């Protein structure tokens, strides 16, 4: 495994509050790293599958830091120190800030959050059977400040606390006395 998504278990829990697809390994970061390095020592090429969980992208899932998480960056640095070729297979639902990775990792394959056939497609690319010639639908920024601000107003109260959901919703037609409505010009709709 190499590492957990994040070193802080509580933050990891909040980051994946809309789905619990992550299964945290309770071993220490050092134990996980040592295991990954032992496997890497027996390998000719290292394929590091890193990035975000799918729950970290989408509504109410904003991050102030769009770099790789601390545990993943440490794992990647240690894998590169082995001197073996490293391919970063990046799973993400949004552009990340990858300045360090771009400068240090020989090959980065961005696979987004692919579907059930992703393993076959990624394998075809890694083994050279298919050229990864797709065009990116977005630009990966050099810093968070380069990303346009689309949500520039106060938080609406989400995410809700564990177990708290909207309890009631009501929708009604409103009866209005039409004699009170005055239209100055004809309207079209």
Regions found by a protein language model. Name each.
Residues 22-27, 64-67:
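Short, flexible loop segments at the rims of nucleotide/cofactor-binding pockets, characterized by
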Residues 1-5:
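Catalytic alpha/large subunits of respiratory electron-transfer oxidoreductases
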Residues 43:
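An anion/phosphate-binding loop that grips the pyrophosphate of nucleotide cofactors and donors
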Residues 82-86, 105:
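A short helix->loop->beta-strand "cap" motif at the edges of active sites that frequently abuts
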Residues 31, 35-38, 70-74, 78, ...:
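Extracytoplasmic/secreted proteins, especially bacterial periplasmic and envelope-associated proteins
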Residues 52-69:
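Glycine/threonine-rich flexible loop motifs
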Residues 6-24, 91-184, 188:
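Secreted, periplasmic, or luminal enzymes acting at the cell surface/secretory milieu
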């Amino acid at each position: 495994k190499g590492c957990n998504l994040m070193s802080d278990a509580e933050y990891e829990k909040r980051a994946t509050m809309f789905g619990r697809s992550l299964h945290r390994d309770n071993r220490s970061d050092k134990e996980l790293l040592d295991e990954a390095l032992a496997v890497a020592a027996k390998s000719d090429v290292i394929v590091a599958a890193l990035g975000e969980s799918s729950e970290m992208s989408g509504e109410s899932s904003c991050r102030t830091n769009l770099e790789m998480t601390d545990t993943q960056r440490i794992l990647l640095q240690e894998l590169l120190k082995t001197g073996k070729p490293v391919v970063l297979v990046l799973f993400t639902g949004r552009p990340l800030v990858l300045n360090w990775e771009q400068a240090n990792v020989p090959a980065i394959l961005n696979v987004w959050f692919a579907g059930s056939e992703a393993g076959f497609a990624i394998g075809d690319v890694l083994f050279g059977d298919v050229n990864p010639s797709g065009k990116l639908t977005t630009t990966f920024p050099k810093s968070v400040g380069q990303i346009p601000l689309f949500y520039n107003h106060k938080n609406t109260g989400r995410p809700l606390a564990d177990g708290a959901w909207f309890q009631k919703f009501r929708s009604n037609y409103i009866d209005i006395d039409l004699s009170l409505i005055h239209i100055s010009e004809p309207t079209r709709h």
